[in-house]
Curated annotation (Swiss-Prot):
Keywords: ATP-binding, Ligase, Magnesium, Metal-binding, NAD, Nucleotide-binding. One of its GO terms (biological process) is NAD biosynthetic process. Belongs to the NAD synthetase family. It comes from the Bacteria. GO terms for molecular function: ATP binding; glutaminase activity; metal ion binding; NAD+ synthase (glutamine-hydrolyzing) activity; NAD+ synthase activity. Its EC number is 6.3.1.5. It catalyses: deamido-NAD(+) + NH4(+) + ATP = AMP + diphosphate + NAD(+) + H(+). Deamido-NAD(+) binds at R147, K180, D187, H267, K268. Pfam families: NAD_synthase. Pathway: Cofactor biosynthesis; NAD(+) biosynthesis; NAD(+) from deamido-NAD(+) (ammonia route): step 1/1. Homodimer. Catalyzes the ATP-dependent amidation of deamido-NAD to form NAD. Uses ammonia as a nitrogen source. This is NH(3)-dependent NAD(+) synthetase.
């Protein structure tokens, strides 16, 4: 393992590869217990998570639903619940997969909040967009969509006195592949430290359909590049990112891209700068 790989892996608290099925099961139990402890320590009984249709929110949702189920069983308190929220922007192209994810999770409650009108209303008020290239406006509004989704989730959580779950994991964190104060904002991040193939392995452990587990990851935030795969944005594959984080050799170009991207996105992984 290169020293830089070791340093980054330590900073992101990357978990080692699952040695076997027992190790995977133990990690699932540890993360379910983590979620339960977060709720109990906060003296709250509701979890809220936006379900996009990707494997990250699918896996986080499965962990959350199991956590509240176990809390109900162990405490006898049926007030513990998990709310899955669909947050489409107008019409979502992969709505079928998103609904399939929600159906498989079987959350206690499911809500739908369309963020389209809110994002468009805000965009209409921003005079700074005047004269900007369409691609620049599209990129900025992509981040606005992510932040609006988090606003919606926190609004639901506030109404139900709950905590918001995030879906960030090590393979996204190392690339800074999240919107600051958007999908990067949450109360607890149960996938933290996992690489992408571990997130998929946990989804499979729950019996999730392979079509959802292996669905091509996409943030799908930009109207001018609908459904753009994450890997096209990264310039490297998730397999290469996972290998890098686990100290395995990767091609020279992938090593360079990951290290440079990690350095320039450091501000996204820190608290606001202060004097």
């Amino acid at each position: 393992m290169h020293a830089v790989q070791r340093q980054i892996a330590e900073q992101l608290k990357v978990q080692p590869p699952f040695a076997d099925q027992n190790a995977l099961q133990a990690e699932v139990a540890r993360r379910v217990n983590f979620i339960k402890e977060c709720l109990q320590n906060a003296r709250l009984k509701t979890l809220v998570l936006g379900i996009s249709g990707g494997v990250d929110s699918l896996t986080a949702g499965l962990l959350a639903q199991r956590a509240v189920k176990e809390l109900r069983e162990s405490t006898g308190d049926n007030a513990y619940r998990f709310i899955a929220v669909r947050l489409p922007y107008v019409v979502q192209a992969d709505e079928h997969e998103a609904q399939a994810s929600v159906d498989f999770i079987e959350p206690d409650e499911r809500h739908t909040i369309n963020i389209g009108s809110s994002v468009k209303a805000l965009a209409a008020e921003v005079k700074a967009f005047d004269g900007l290239p369409a691609t620049s406006v599209d990129f900025v509004l992509g981040n606005t969509k992510a932040r609006m989704r988090m606003v919606a989730q926190y609004t639901v959580a506030g109404a139900y006195h709950g905590l918001v779950i995030g879906t960030d994991h090590a393979a996204e964190a190392v690339m800074g592949f999240f919107t600051k104060f958007g999908d990067g904002a949450c109360d607890l991040a149960p996938l933290s430290g996992l690489v992408k193939n571990q997130v998929r392995a946990i989804a499979r452990h729950f019996g999730a359909p392979e079509s959802l587990v292996e669905k091509v990851p996409t943030a799908d935030l930009e109207d001018l590049s609908p459904g753009k795969p994450d890997e096209a944005s990264h310039g490297v594959t998730y397999a290469e990112i996972d290998a890098f984080l686990h100290g395995e050799p990767v091609r020279e170009e992938a090593f360079r891209i990951i290290c440079e991207t990690y350095a320039k996105t450091q501000h996204k992984r820190e608290l606001p700068y202060a004097p």
